[in-house]
Amino acid sequence: MRIGKRRKMSGELRVRRVSSWEFDLILREAEKYGELSHEFFSIVEGEYRDVYAVNESVWKLVEKLPLKPYSLGTFVGTIRVDDNLVEKFYPNIEFFSLVKVTKNYAVLGPKASFLFTTGKDVPKRAVKKLNWQGSRKILIYNDLGDIIGIGMINPRNDEKFIKNLKDVGEFLRR
């Protein structure tokens, strides 16, 4: 759990619980892959609305603090308006540790997993297991069961069958 002081920004940060509309956005994203196993989220509003998974006991402590934190719990994604002016929840990889994944995932072997975590796309022959139910985005696992990223499936291209959208090695490449 990370609780820190408020960042100096041009606008005021606001910490609050998620609204029912925001929770619905989070729930809809989780349902593309399985079942959400966590129910308590908070929002830190600044330039974007950052979503954090917290538990109720932590939230009760935060409510009593004289200074509001700029982050708390586990950062799981951001809610923002897309190019079509539609409000969406954009999850990060950590979000999926809160989802019981049952669909829209691929399992890669060791070599393909390594290449995926270096930003490479995945050919169809490197996919050991595929559970795809129509979603364009799929979760990528290594053969040990670790989530290593998020990809976009391209059924028309066997060489770039899964396009790398986000992976756990991204942070190290910055």
From Swiss-Prot:
GO MF term set: RNA binding
Taxonomic superkingdom: Archaea
Family annotation (Pfam families): pre-PUA_NIP7, UPF0113
Coiled coil location: none
InterPro entries the UniProt entry points to: NIP7_N, PUA_sf, UPF0113_PUA
Entry's family note: Belongs to the UPF0113 family.
Listed name of the protein: UPF0113 protein PH0281
Organism: Pyrococcus horikoshii (strain ATCC 700860 / DSM 12428 / JCM 9974 / NBRC 100139 / OT-3)
